[in-house]
């Protein structure tokens, strides 16, 4: 789909408060486009946009798009949205975020990070290495980087590092120069319908990578291995713990606040090379894989091992990725975005590896009824490394469905499959009461979820 854009257009973002939409809006504003938007409620992303003089209306209303000439819609926007319907009625051009993103980055050399999990951290790690190498890239990420306090920034070079969004299939329209596939998991089934359809989309994405670029695919994921059989251009390299990986992880050491590892590089045209004593200030094997993806792409464009290692060592992290918020009774409280069984398992595995003698208390807010119902078996086993799970009410994320799902039954299944203590709470006051009565001694607390749980954790000290 070809998009014709003039700087005189008034481009309206429906659902501008999402992390991906807000990042794209900010970049387009800095490129000189006339941007405005709307969302159902205020948040930190919207406040950041307002500081950049982007007009935003809270609430969706057809009057909001009265003077608009182009509409960009979030994947979270339903077809009965009043602004969407008004735009259709007035025959305004309507584009998905991924379509507009593809247009913006099509004239840049880029690194596109795709996958079910780990995209945000991987995008951030690649960006940090590029910055260390004095390649000032444009960055469009799915999380706020602590190094510059935003999810997006306009760079001075002709490079763009961006995180894709697979939720509506539009990521296949982004033309990558270099592409990364972290993993493929059962997500966004409401759109794809089956894991096979999802895998086929990733095949298209990888096949879009040109001969002068390269794809980097993690070999530690079964679904990733499956798509290798279908990729037609064969222009890819692999990474991971798997011994067949072109960039193989080994000699892993994890401490409380950092990880050290080595990489063995085996390329078809060269003799074996090694990058040793790579240090990252984050924990978990999943993050070591993310860092290895960043090493692979950076090495392939010619960045030196020293600059790669410096970029990783000085990484300042991403908000809501195992972020320490406060301590109570000397017990640390962390906030994490994990909301899928695979993500939860990986975070807890990493925490257990370095906090071996601590009891793990997980405060979990499920995100979407449909996800919990469709993956209830996987969820019921995901918390095996935790000692206590505090279950918060489901964050519905706009879903007005019941699906005949009983939350209390899920709690029972969690107890049965993971053999852990499960406590149901109804609100923040319940959480404060639980904390006062139970959080002390040799414990570590992690809030998990993609909804409002981050606010619950951050506001908890005021209730204690």
Which residues does each PLM region occupy?
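Short acidic low-complexity segments
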Residues: 55-66, 150, 430, 435
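Conserved N-terminal Rossmann-fold NAD(P)-binding element of oxidoreductases
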Residues: 11-16, 448
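Nucleotide phosphate-binding/pyrophosphate-handling subdomain across enzymes
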Residues: 2-12, 20, 24-31, 255-257, ...
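Phosphate-binding loop of NTP-binding sites
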Residues: 2-5, 13, 20, 27-33, ...
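C-terminal helical cap/extension that packs against the catalytic core
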Residues: 380-441
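Beta-strand->loop->alpha-helix junctions that form or flank phosphate-binding loops
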Residues: 38-39, 57-60, 95-99, 140, ...
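NAD(P)-binding Rossmann-fold cofactor-contacting core
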Residues: 33-48
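Conserved beta-strand positions in the Rossmann-like core of class I SAM-dependent methyltransferases
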Residues: 34-37, 138, 390, 423
């Amino acid at each position: 789909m070809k998009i014709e854009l003039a700087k005189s257009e008034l481009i309206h973002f429906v659902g501008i408060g999402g992390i991906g939409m807000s990042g794209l809006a900010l970049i387009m504003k800095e490129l000189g486009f006339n941007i405005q938007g709307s969302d159902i409620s205020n948040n930190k992303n919207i406040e950041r946009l307002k500081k950049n003089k982007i007009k935003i209306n809270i609430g969706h209303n057809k009057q909001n798009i009265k003077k608009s000439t182009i509409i960009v819609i979030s994947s979270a926007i339903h077809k009965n949205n009043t602004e969407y319907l008004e735009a259709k009625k007035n025959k305004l051009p309507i584009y998905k975020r991924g379509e507009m993103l593809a247009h913006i980055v099509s004239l840049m050399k880029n690194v596109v990070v795709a996958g079910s999990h780990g995209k945000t951290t991987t995008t951030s790690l690649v960006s940090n290495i590029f910055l260390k190498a004095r390649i000032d890239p444009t960055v469009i990420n799915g999380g706020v980087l602590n190094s510059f306090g935003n999810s997006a920034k306009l760079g001075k070079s002709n490079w763009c590092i961006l995180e894709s969004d697979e939720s509506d299939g539009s990521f296949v329209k982004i033309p990558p120069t270099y592409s990364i596939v972290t993993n493929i998991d059962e997500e966004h089934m409401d759109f794809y319908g089956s894991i096979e359809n999802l895998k086929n989309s990733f095949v298209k994405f990888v096949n879009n990578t040109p001969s002068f670029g390269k794809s980097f695919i993690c070999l530690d994921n079964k679904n990733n291995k499956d798509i290798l059989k279908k990729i037609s251009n064969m222009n890819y390299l692999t990474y991971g713990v798997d011994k067949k990986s072109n960039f193989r992880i080994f000699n892993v050491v994890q401490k409380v606040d950092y990880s050290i590892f080595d990489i063995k590089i085996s390329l078809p045209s060269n003799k074996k090379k090694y990058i040793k004593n790579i240090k990252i200030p984050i924990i978990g094997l999943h993050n070591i894989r993310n860092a290895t993806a960043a090493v692979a792409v950076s090495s392939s464009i010619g960045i030196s091992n020293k600059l790669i290692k410096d970029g990783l060592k000085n990484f300042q992290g991403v908000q809501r990725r195992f972020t320490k918020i406060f301590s109570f009774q000397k017990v640390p409280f962390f906030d994490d975005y994990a909301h899928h069984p695979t993500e939860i398992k990986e975070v807890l595995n990493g925490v257990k590896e370095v906090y071996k003698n601590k009891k793990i208390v997980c405060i979990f807010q499920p995100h979407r009824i449909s996800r919990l119902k469709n993956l209830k078996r996987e969820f019921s086993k995901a918390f095996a490394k935790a000692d206590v799970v505090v279950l918060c009410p489901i964050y519905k994320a706009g879903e007005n469905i019941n699906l005949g799902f009983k939350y209390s039954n899920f709690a029972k299944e969690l107890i049965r499959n993971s053999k852990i203590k499960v406590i149901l709470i109804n609100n923040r006051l319940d959480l404060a009461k639980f904390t006062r009565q139970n959080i002390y001694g040799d414990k570590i607390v992690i809030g998990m979820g993609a909804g409002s749980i981050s606010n619950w954790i951050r506001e908890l000290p005021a209730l204690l």
